[in-house]
Amino acid sequence: VFGTGPLGLFAVQIARIMGAVNIVMVGLEEDVETRFPIAMEVGATHCVNASKEDVVKRCTEICGRDNLGLVIECSGANIALKQSLEMLRPNGEVIRVGMGFKPLEFSINNITELNKSIIGHMAYDSTSWRESIRLLKSGAIKVQPMITHRLGLSKWKEGFAAMADKSAVKVIFHYDEEDKDVAEFGEEETPNDYDFND
């Protein structure tokens, strides 16, 4: 899985649920402190630092060339798509969830030569939503580890800065003094935001 944001972290969890043996999260140096530990908590078996490691070589070592049949690309970076295709076995699939806006500067001829597929995914139908809620309700999908910050609206700059420097994954803003949950439960005892049993 390329990309350490919420989409990538959810993809790791779906891979775990589907029974993947090796689930590799690929990120950058700035992901090592916060996002890699969360990836391991939610189901990644390995994390690869693309800032320091040869991603294709390392993922191939971990999984074995013949087992790299599915890569989920959530970053939108062209280099991630290139590396995804390079490591992918013949007849494998890259699911492209991340959005990139720069033109590709590499050949994709080997998707024809080796019968590889790139599948774009963006839309969600009612079936997807129902399945997502079912997985959340059952506890199979973990959301809480991704909520790294809870801040009052007066600290919005701090929240945006944390997102920009990747020290946060998801930031939840609440009303400052008037917030019902904070007034009732206190800042440190905010109730579960995803309680689907009510």
What residue spans do the PLM features occupy?
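N-terminal Rossmann-like NAD(P) cofactor-binding module of classical short-chain dehydrogenase/reductase
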Residues: G69-I72, I95
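ADP-ribose/adenylate-binding Rossmann-like module
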Residues: E86-P103, S117-H121
